[in-house]
């Protein structure tokens, strides 16, 4: 069975540094598993690998969509599996690298993802239900037709509740049944990079300061000037939506930066919950001899 190395971990843990150094040593190529780095024109806020880093090792699934374009989990899975197969066919080693839990699980666990395209009118109708009757009402609808999915998805995650209802209403099949898994066509070695949470928070805060110094606020302004609306999934993502009050004149920049810190810390906690459920994890801390040797 073909080899795959997966490097997972929360934001700011050091995935990119390790992945690039390791890829150089083993003739590897990096397949990004980051739901924000797929977007062009969004470089600073997504902590996208720099041009220098991308030149040191081939990268895949970065800068493949414009900010207004949709990108589903099924599309990611298809493109990631194709990239992995292509890399292996050329005798190179694929490294799946990222912190988006669903992206990682879809590839590593062999998720069977419903190929139901987005239904804008249906989504708008369901969004109105959530808005006027509350997320709990929408979640109750899901529980009535797919209790397994409802048990997995919290009522507060309106986007996933809507997707589950959309799949059922279009296909007539519960999304939980359509998401049954089969073994992937490779043998993954999954490495979870782990640091103490206080250290992660400090590293994330320092990176936010670097982002601000590098022009993150200007990047957001340029996206808005280009016609990209806050309602887009890309613009509502971490690193961008936190600046909406600043650009709408309802908060100062310092307040928005503090909100970005707070939301990033919360995101780190959610990421760690995802990684714990991945199978066959090797946990590496910064003093792990292999981690130290690779980046030396």
UniProtKB/Swiss-Prot annotation:
GO terms for biological process: tRNA modification. ATP binds at residues 9-16. It is an enzyme of class 2 (transferase). Its EC number is 2.5.1.75. Coiled coil: none annotated. The record marks 100, 123 as: Interaction with substrate tRNA. It comes from the Bacteria. Keywords: ATP-binding, Magnesium, Nucleotide-binding, Transferase, tRNA processing. InterPro entries: Dimethylallyltransferase (IPR039657), IPT (IPR018022), P-loop_NTPase (IPR027417). Its cofactor is Mg(2+). It catalyses: adenosine(37) in tRNA + dimethylallyl diphosphate = N(6)-dimethylallyladenosine(37) in tRNA + diphosphate. Residues 34-37 are annotated as: Interaction with substrate tRNA. SUPFAM superfamilies: P-loop containing nucleoside triphosphate hydrolases. Substrate binds at residues 11-16. One of its GO terms (molecular function) is ATP binding. Monomer. Catalyzes the transfer of a dimethylallyl group onto the adenine at position 37 in tRNAs that read codons beginning with uridine, leading to the formation of N6-(dimethylallyl)adenosine (i(6)A). Belongs to the IPP transferase family. HAMAP family: IPP_trans (MF_00185). PANTHER family: TRNA DIMETHYLALLYLTRANSFERASE (PTHR11088:SF60). This is tRNA dimethylallyltransferase.
